[in-house]
């Protein structure tokens, strides 16, 4: 009876039945830190703020948990600024007379500003030049620059009456002499052709024999004409034979003469033989005449045999000597003896 009264009248207080624990759906600090770092690592700095997803109410943006603010986004973020906005900002911040500096950043094609047209320097692309020539067939297009020519003050104001300034630079309208050096080859070609025509049509050309008109091979380089040598005179009576003359005296005589001068003297080692003393550009040459078994006279190893010394001298007075060191020389100027 007492138990029933206590339960019915609630004298001792009625306890509620035990309830299950309330689940905790909040994320742990470690999980929130991981997600915040992941968002920072894979964040697109150029993504518009409007297109970003709203943060989770229970995430780091929830104001109910002030301790979670340390996992928010960093303060220094990359923000995309349009080129037009950047130019307007520079114009507002800079002075009225200050020129806008060229944007040195890399821009997307749609952000690039149109550049001013480059100055005309006379150069034209082949395709453009072809298009201009096809579009303007009746108008002469000047593809090359003309040289600058100073004009007189009076001609710059206007040409005098009855005279027309020379603006054309064609060869047939050129007033300069025909032998000027700055003319190209094509301008002188006509003058050269006329000069050759006058030369070939002249009476002197008609009187020349036909064999001379033929194209001949140029003769080998030969020395200039030498003084005449008479091979009929014996060696002792030749004016260039000096008899017993030593080498020093021969060089003293040749030192006063020019290149190609020569004399014949008796040899110092063998008075029965003769020697040739020659003046060259490099000094003096002393060559000894030798005789073969047939009693022929030779000069060096490559010389042909001759009956006498005067004939050998006559032969090499018009031909180079076949001697090493004197291949370009000939016996041109004999040094005659001085009679008392």
Curated annotation (Swiss-Prot):
Free-text description of this protein's post-translational modifications in UniProt: Tyrosine phosphorylated by ABL.
KW Phosphoprotein (keyword) present: yes
Asked if the Swiss-Prot or TrEMBL record annotates the protein with the keyword Membrane, the reply is no
Q: Could you tell me which InterPro entries the record lists for this protein?
A: SH2, SH2_dom_sf, SH2_domain_adapters, SHD_SH2
Domain SH2, by residue range, is 240-335
CDD domains in the record = SH2_SHD
Keywords, sorted A to Z: Phosphoprotein, SH2 domain
Region described as Disordered: spans on this chain: 1-77, 94-186, 198-230
| UniProt-recorded name of the protein | SH2 domain-containing adapter protein D
Q: Where is the composition biased (Basic and acidic residues)?
A: 171-186
The leader peptide range reads none
Instruction: List where Acidic residues composition bias occurs.
Output: 98-108
Which parts pass through the membrane? none
For this UniProt entry, the molecular function terms from Gene Ontology, in alphabetical order, are: phosphotyrosine residue binding
Known role: May function as an adapter protein.
Q: Which gene encodes it?
A: SHD
């Amino acid at each position: 009876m007492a138990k029933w009264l206590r339960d019915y009248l609630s004298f001792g207080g009625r306890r509620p039945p035990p309830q299950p624990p309330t689940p905790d759906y909040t994320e742990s600090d470690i999980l929130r830190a991981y997600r915040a770092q992941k968002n920072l690592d894979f964040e697109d700095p150029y993504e518009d703020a409007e297109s970003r997803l709203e943060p989770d109410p229970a995430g780091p943006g929830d104001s109910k948990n002030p301790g979670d603010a340390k996992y928010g986004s960093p303060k220094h973020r990359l923000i995309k600024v349009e080129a037009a906005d950047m130019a307007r900002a520079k114009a507002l911040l800079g002075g009225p007379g200050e020129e806008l500096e060229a944007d040195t950043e890399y821009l997307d094609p749609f952000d690039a500003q149109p550049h001013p047209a480059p100055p005309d320097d006379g150069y034209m692309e082949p395709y453009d030049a072809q298009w201009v020539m096809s579009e303007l067939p009746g108008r002469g297009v000047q593809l090359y620059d003309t040289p600058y020519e100073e004009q007189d003050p009076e001609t710059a104001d206007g040409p005098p009456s009855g005279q027309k300034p020379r603006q054309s630079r064609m060869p047939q309208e050129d007033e300069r002499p025909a032998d000027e050096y700055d003319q190209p080859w094509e301008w002188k070609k006509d003058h050269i052709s006329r000069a050759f025509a006058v030369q070939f049509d002249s009476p002197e050309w008609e009187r020349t024999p036909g064999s001379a008109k033929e194209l001949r091979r140029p003769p080998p380089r030969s020395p200039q004409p030498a003084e005449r040598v008479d091979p009929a005179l014996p060696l002792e009576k030749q004016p260039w034979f000096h008899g017993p003359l030593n080498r020093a005296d021969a060089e003293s005589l040749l030192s006063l003469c020019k290149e190609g001068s020569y004399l014949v003297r008796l040899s110092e080692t063998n008075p029965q033989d003769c020697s040739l003393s020659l003046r060259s550009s490099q000094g003096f040459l002393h060559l000894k005449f030798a005789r073969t078994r047939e009693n022929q006279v030779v000069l060096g190893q490559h010389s042909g045999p001759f009956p006498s010394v005067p004939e050998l001298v006559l032969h090499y007075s018009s031909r180079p000597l076949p001697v090493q060191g004197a291949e370009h020389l000939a016996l041109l100027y004999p040094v005659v003896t001085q009679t008392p």
